[in-house]
Regions:
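N-terminal, positively charged, Ser/Thr/Ala/Gly-biased leader segments
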Residues: 1-23
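C-terminal membrane-associated helical module and adjoining short loops/tails
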Residues: 2, 7, 152-322
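Intramembrane alpha-helical segments
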Residues: 2, 7-8, 76-158, 168, ...
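Alpha-helical transmembrane segments of integral membrane proteins
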Residues: 13-17, 21, 42-50, 88-92, ...
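Membrane-embedded alpha-helical segments that form the functional core of polytopic membrane enzymes
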Residues: 18-65, 97-105, 110-125, 176-193, ...
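Membrane-embedded alpha-helical segments in integral membrane proteins
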Residues: 20-32, 95-103, 148-150, 227-237, ...
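Acidic (Asp/Glu-rich) catalytic motifs at the cytosolic membrane interface
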Residues: 50-88, 193-210, 319-320
Length: 322
């Protein structure tokens, strides 16, 4: 069953990286709206599935636009190998995007607008900007917008009235949900920017081993600096500081472990090293999101979301994530 070409086309392991983005945004903006959160759980579920459908539509459309390149570099993929017809893939992409937009419309007009913006951004990336200078910037923007998408439920008519006094956006405790939302979005942006920058060399045979090794060292230093900045801001912004720190330290440890292993692989084959880093950084996005969720709702909530890495890792052994 895991060898089914449609599962490979949809890259099922990747699906588990999507819900945490939405949950982070949802919790960030709803911390000061505890009375409204219960009635908004349905919106959270709808936004999660909408985001998943948009993501799947993006993956399929990516393979449709890349079919000529994949015939040379990845001939075993479902489309270039002929296991799935191009027309079938096109229908799947249209269906996924349509479902994503329709579900968003059930939340509110802002959610629908963001879902439309996500779809347009995904298609522009796949068609025009995937191989250009703006590649990492656009992909990072799309994924960070997904976090904001999770917070879009707040514009529903039933909760907008709660914002009229402005007290919830900047509470007496000094906590600002909007600043936390911005921080979480920036964290996801940075992570995806690094990931996408690296993935550019994934199918390039002329990757220099020495250059890759230097890149790994630079990335590790950059990550360390970024985490220090994030930690400093998080201490001020999040309610559950210790819970956040626990998972951030886990994230830091896993990032260090990832690049240490990649450095050893570099001596064998640069291309395989890039694939290894890209795949695992995608999985580690779940842990990064889980840290913010722990800071927003406690360690238990963050730990539960972090468990999404398990099906991601297991399925990733049989189905390519890149």
């Amino acid at each position: 069953m895991l060898q089914n070409p449609y599962l490979k086309l949809l890259r099922i392991p990747n699906v588990f990286t999507v819900p945490p983005d939405i949950i982070v945004g949802f919790l960030a903006i709803s911390i000061d709206f505890s009375s409204s959160v219960g009635s908004s759980i349905s919106d959270l579920i709808i936004l999660i599935f909408s985001s998943i459908f948009l993501y799947l539509g993006g993956l399929v459309s990516n393979d449709l636009f890349d079919i000529k390149v994949d015939r040379l570099e990845r001939p075993s993929r479902p489309l270039p190998s002929g296991k799935i017809k191009k027309t079938n893939a096109l229908l799947i992409a249209v269906l996924m995007f349509s479902l994503g937009l329709i579900l968003a419309a059930f939340v509110n007009h802002v959610s629908f607008g963001i879902s439309l913006l996500l779809m347009v951004g995904i298609l522009l990336y796949n068609y025009k900007f995937k191989n250009g200078f703006f590649r990492p910037y656009l992909m990072a923007a799309i994924r960070s917008l997904n976090v904001i998408y999770g917070a879009s439920f707040i514009f529903d008519v039933s909760t907008t009235s709660a914002l009229e006094n402005g007290d919830h956006l900047f509470s007496n405790t000094g906590f600002s949900p909007l600043l936390l939302l911005a921080l979480a979005s920036c964290a996801v942006y940075f992570h995806i920017y690094i990931l996408t920058s690296l993935s550019k060399s994934e199918t390039t045979q002329a990757v220099s081993r020495i250059k890759n090794k230097l890149n790994i060292q630079k990335i590790q230093i950059t990550y360390l600096l970024f985490l220090l900045i994030s930690l400093s801001l998080a201490i001020i912004l999040i309610p559950f500081k210790l819970d956040f720190l626990i998972i951030v330290l886990l994230f830091l440890f896993l990032i260090k472990l990832l690049f240490n292993r990649a450095s050893k692989m570099d001596r064998i084959q640069g291309e395989e090293m890039i694939k290894f880093i890209v795949k695992n950084m995608l999985i580690l996005l779940i842990i990064l999101d889980s840290a913010f969720i722990a800071g927003e709702a406690g360690l238990l909530a963050g730990s539960i979301v972090a468990l999404l890495t398990i099906p991601c890792v297991i399925l990733g052994k049989w189905i390519s994530m890149t």
